[in-house]
Amino acid sequence: MATVGFLGTGLLGSGMVERMLRRGDAVTVWNRTASKARALEPLGARVAATPGDAVAGAEHVHMTLPDDAVVDEMLEKVRPQLRTDAIIIDHSTTSPAGTKKRVPRLNGAGIKFIHAPVFMSPQMARDGVGLVLVSGPRAIYEDVRSELEKMTGEVWYVGEEPDRSAAYKIFGNSMLFVIAAGVSDVFAMAKGLGIPAADALAVFSKFQPGGVIKARGEKMARGDFSATFELTMARKDMRLMLEAAGSQPTVVLPSIAKRMDDAIAKGHGQDDLGAIAAEVVR
C-alpha cells in the first residue's frame, strides 16, 4: 500500500484518486476549491487543510494542476513538508520551457521530481486506462514505474530530456483541437447544405482519416512532397468546402485555404497537399 499525497482534485485528479483508493492506497488530497477534495472523503481519502499537510509523510506526491505558475507555487509551499525520499510526479500539462527549467532545478536541489502528463479522460483515469508520458531522470522513472503502471494502460518513457513529455503532450492535444475544429467545420458545411449534423458524421463510420497522420505525416516529416494529392486539386476541393459552408462560421478551413494559397504561390502547386508544411520541415 502506497502513501500518497495528491494536489489538485479537479476532474482528472479526482479520477486518479478514485483509482488509487480502490486499490487500497492511503491518499491525502488537497484542492484549492475545498469542496472538490471533500467529495473524495466518502471514498476513503483524507482531506488536508493545506498543500503542505497533503504531502507530509507521503512517499509519492502526485499533482494535476492548471499551469506552470500554479505548479511552481505549490512546489514552493510544500518543500518544507516533503519527506527527504519523496518523489513528486507531475501530471499537469505544462509548457516545455517551464518543465525544462523545473526538472533539473528541483533534482539539483535534492528533490526527486519527474514530469508525467497523461492522455486520458476522467473516466479513463478511474478505469486505469490511457497513456502516461514520462521524461526526466531514468533512475527516478524506474522508482515510480510500477506505480504508474497501476494507474494506466500504458506508460511511455520518452527519454532523459526533461521537456520531451511536455512537448509530446501539447503535440497530442493540438491534434485533438484540430479534430474538434474540423468536425465543427464539417457541421458548418452540413448546415449550409441542409444536412443534419448526425447524418454528416455517418461519413466517418466508413471513411476514417486518422491513418493520414502516419501515411502522409511520415512523408511530410521527411520533406517528401511527391504528389498523391496535388495541392492545386486540394485547393479546388477547399473552394467547394467553403462554398458549401456559405455564411456558416468555420474554424480552420479559411486558415488552411490561406496556407494552401501561400504554398502554391511559392511553387508547390504540383506538389502533394503535405507541401503546406514545407516551411516548417525543411
Segments predicted by a language model, with ranges:
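Hydrophobic beta-strand scaffold residues
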Residues: 27, 47, 113-114, 155, ...
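NAD(P)+-binding Rossmann beta1-loop-alpha1 motif at the extreme N-terminus of oxidoreductases
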Residues: 1-63
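Helical "substrate-binding/catalytic lid" subdomain
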Residues: 162-280
